[in-house]
């Protein structure tokens, strides 16, 4: 692109697949050329040379065709003027060919003194600072922190006007009393000296007289008269007219007269700050003059005086031992000077703002995009010159509203932290008006899912469990209520507990007698429920059974897993008819009574199912109505008993028979009868033709043939007859 092609190297043929947007321009130019040729070669337009036959008659000034012809003329003149620098010429257009525009790079000499910056406005609409901004527009670098608090150009101009008006007003107020107190002779003589241009001593004498008069007039001001002091305006006026010597002499005369006046009256002269006059150089006020000499605060000792170092002991010529110290080295990194310079230049961003400050754009330097942007400049000969962009800036608009500073935002947040949001108060008001205290308190209770209606009647009630509330522990911090008789203390404690239970807790409970179950909920821990028992039994099956097993509730070792699971999921089947005495002692909770009352309306069909079968004993589970038809305890329909039911009713005493007692009796019968010995036939029948799970097979054999001897025989027979299939199964060996 930077190479300049000679005229001979261009054959004039453009590419055939060029973009069609050039076609419209080519057709327009051909039309203009044809029209100019029809007008004739004799007439010529003003300002157009007659050498070309294509240029003809006069065209109207406001006609766009005339502007096109004028442009062609300028291009032709530019090509002739630039013939020494460039050999490129615009080729005569052919209707069958496309136009070619040469592209060249800018010379290195021109690029040295040129810096090109691109400004991009990040906005959806087109931004034109000349039309969209309020002129004049200012582009400068400045600190953008707290930009909303910085003054705009309009505010600065307004304040400058106010300050200038204030200064003029103050000068007028100062000059008004001074004009009346000035001596006429002094002013006339001063004006004469200035107009006549007399020598410096003459002006000096005049200023001395004026200053002397001013001092004499200032003395009564100390004593309390109303005559104002002389103003130093005369001295400044002399200085403004070029009489500098007069000002210095006037100052000297003022000092001498003031000193004589002070000595004469014996009182110090008080000078106001406004009357002190301007300093020699206001920029150097408060600075200390340095003469280059070193100032020492310590007193100098002459010869014959006491030496301050006389009390210091001599060192004896000893020196401190210095080892071979290694020279400390540090690593230095050479910084790029261009990067350092760029960081210094871009420390403050560019800010473009208009006069009123309504349009403020802040530019950020984009280092990565500077290499991909160029400018194409149109030259006089129709070619383009490519100029690389040095820097690219992206301008973003600043907010037109004032934002909060960090301190103001923290104060706002501190104020809001103690307040409650408005919507929350409204929500609380709706709750208070639409619901009652009973509903609001009941929301805190957690509902527990009910189990099936079939298992509801068989659920054990823990109300018979009584906790010892009178037991005292060593870590109890509660002191006894009354020191005295223990029996009276116990009665008072029980009375207080009853009152607490009978108290109506915010209208949530009905007026009814407290139950023992509620006492457990308030003052003690409830007995482990069915879920807890199920979890405990599941833990006992694991390897940590010794930690969770108890002496009271031991699992029967002769029960199978199916029996244990059935026992966990179901309540005991065999219950007594005559359980009135037990039901009186057991008082169910009101919640359970309510559930039973609701379940009573639900019609349930009587069901009967087999719970377990072991050792020719079948345990049935069913409804109470069906179980009443069977005799109590163990029953064998094949055995005939010559005992009437009436005799059984008179002889037997009703006593509660539980499932655990029946299990214990069966266990005792098993212990009395000797265990059968296992044989190979039993193993073959148990395994069968297919695969068997090893664990289930072992449990089945140990349950059917208990004993250590049968266990050893089982291992020997299994090793002899079976083979392992996988990790968990086995089968009989095929012969």
Swiss-Prot record:
GO CC entries: nucleus; transcription factor TFIIF complex
Annotated Polar residues bias: 175-219, 239-263, 636-654
Keyword DNA-binding: yes
Biased composition range(s): Low complexity: 33-54, 220-238
Residues annotated with Phosphoserine modification: 198, 515, 560, 562, 571, 655
Free-text description of this protein's post-translational modifications in UniProt: Phosphorylated on Ser and other residues by TAF1 and casein kinase II-like kinases.
Sites bearing Phosphothreonine, chain numbering: 200
Compartment(s): Nucleus
Protein keywords: DNA-binding, Nucleus, Phosphoprotein, Transcription, Transcription regulation
Comp. bias intervals (Acidic residues): 453-465, 471-480, 513-522
Positions of region (Disordered): 1-68, 165-263, 297-323, 446-465, 471-606, 631-674
Job description of the protein: TFIIF is a general transcription initiation factor that binds to RNA polymerase II. Its functions include the recruitment of RNA polymerase II to the promoter bound DNA-TBP-TFIIB complex, decreasing the affinity of RNA polymerase II for non-specific DNA, allowing for the subsequent recruitment of TFIIE and TFIIH, and facilitating RNA polymerase II elongation.
Family designation: Belongs to the TFIIF alpha subunit family.
UniProt miscellaneous comment: Present with 1920 molecules/cell in log phase SD medium.
Subunit structure: TFIIF is composed of three different subunits: TFG1/RAP74, TFG2/RAP30 and TAF14.
Name this protein carries in UniProt: Transcription initiation factor IIF subunit alpha
Organism encoding this protein: Saccharomyces cerevisiae (strain ATCC 204508 / S288c)
Gene: TFG1
């Amino acid at each position: 692109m930077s190479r300049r092609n000679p005229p001979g190297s261009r054959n004039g043929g453009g590419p055939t697949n060029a973009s069609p947007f050039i076609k419209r321009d080519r057709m327009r130019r051909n039309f203009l050329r044809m029209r100019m040729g029809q007008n004739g070669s004799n007439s010529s337009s003003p300002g157009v040379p007659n050498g070309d036959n294509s240029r003809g008659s006069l065209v109207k000034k406001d006609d766009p065709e005339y502007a096109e012809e004028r442009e062609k003329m300028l291009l032709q003149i530019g090509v002739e003027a630039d013939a020494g620098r460039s050999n490129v010429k615009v080729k005569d257009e052919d209707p069958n060919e496309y136009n070619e525009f040469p592209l060249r790079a800018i010379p290195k000499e021109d690029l040295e003194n040129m810096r090109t910056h691109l400004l991009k406005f990040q906005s959806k609409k087109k931004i034109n600072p000349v039309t969209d901004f309020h002129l004049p527009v200012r582009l400068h670098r400045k600190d953008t922190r707290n930009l909303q608090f910085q003054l705009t150009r309009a505010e600065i101009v307004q304040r400058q006007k106010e300050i200038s008006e204030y200064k003029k007003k103050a000068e007028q107020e100062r000059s008004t009393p001074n004009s009346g107190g000035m001596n006429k002779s002094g002013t006339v003589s001063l004006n004469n000296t200035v107009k006549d241009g007399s020598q410096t001593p003459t002006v000096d004498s005049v200023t001395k007289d004026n200053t002397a008069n001013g001092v004499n007039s200032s003395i009564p001001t100390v004593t309390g008269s109303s005559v104002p002091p002389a103003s130093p305006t005369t001295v400044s006026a002399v200085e403004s007219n070029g009489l500098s010597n007069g000002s210095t002499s006037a100052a000297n005369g003022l000092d001498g007269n003031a000193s004589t006046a002070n000595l004469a009256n014996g009182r110090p002269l008080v000078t106001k700050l406004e009357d002190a006059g301007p300093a020699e150089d206001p920029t150097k006020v408060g600075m200390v003059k340095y003469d280059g000499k070193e100032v020492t605060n310590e007193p100098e000792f002459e010869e014959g005086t006491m030496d301050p170092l006389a009390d210091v002991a001599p060192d004896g010529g000893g020196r401190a031992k210095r080892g071979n110290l290694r020279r400390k080295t540090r690593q230095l990194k050479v910084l790029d000077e261009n990067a350092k310079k760029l960081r210094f230049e871009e420390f403050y961003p560019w800010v473009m703002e208009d006069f009123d400050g309504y349009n403020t754009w802040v530019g950020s330097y984009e280092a990565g995009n500077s290499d991909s942007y160029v400018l194409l400049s149109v030259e006089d000969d129709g070619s383009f010159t490519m100029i690389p962009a040095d820097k690219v800036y992206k301008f973003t608009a600043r907010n037109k509203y004032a934002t909060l500073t960090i301190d103001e935002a923290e104060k706002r947040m501190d104020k809001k932290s103690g307040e409650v949001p408005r919507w929350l108060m409204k929500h609380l008001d709706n709750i208070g008006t639409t619901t009652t205290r009973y509903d609001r308190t009941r929301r805190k209770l957690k509902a527990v899912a009910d189990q099936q209606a079939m298992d509801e009647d068989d659920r054990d009630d823990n109300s018979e469990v009584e906790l010892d509330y009178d037991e005292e522990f060593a870590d109890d911090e509660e002191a006894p209520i009354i020191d005295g008789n223990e029996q009276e203390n116990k009665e008072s404690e029980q009375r207080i507990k009853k009152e607490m239970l009978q108290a109506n807790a915010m209208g949530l409970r009905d007026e009814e007698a407290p139950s023992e179950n509620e006492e457990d909920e308030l003052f003690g821990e409830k007995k482990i429920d069915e879920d807890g028992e199920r979890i405990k039994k599941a833990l006992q099956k694991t390897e940590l059974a010794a930690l969770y097993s108890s002496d009271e509730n031991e699992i029967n070792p002769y029960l199978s897993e199916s029996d244990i699971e059935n026992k966990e999921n179901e309540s005991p089947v065999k219950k007594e008819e005559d359980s009135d005495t037990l039901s009186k002692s057991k008082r169910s909770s009101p919640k359970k009574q309510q559930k039973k009352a609701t379940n009573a309306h639900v019609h349930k069909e009587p069901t009967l199912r087999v719970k377990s079968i072991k050792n020719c004993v079948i345990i049935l589970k069913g409804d109470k109505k069906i179980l009443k038809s069977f005799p109590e305890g163990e029953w064998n329909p094949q055995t005939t008993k010559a005992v009437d039911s009436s005799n059984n009713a008179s002889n037997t005493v009703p006593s509660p028979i539980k499932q655990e007692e029946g299990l214990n009796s069966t266990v005792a019968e098993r212990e009395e009868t000797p265990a059968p010995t296992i044989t190979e036939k039993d193993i073959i029948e148990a395994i069968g033709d297919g695969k068997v799970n090893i664990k289930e097979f072992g449990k089945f054999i140990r349950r059917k043939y208990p004993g250590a001897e049968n266990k050893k025989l089982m291992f020997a027979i299994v090793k002899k007859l079976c083979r392992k299939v996988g990790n968990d199964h086995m089968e009989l060996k095929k012969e």
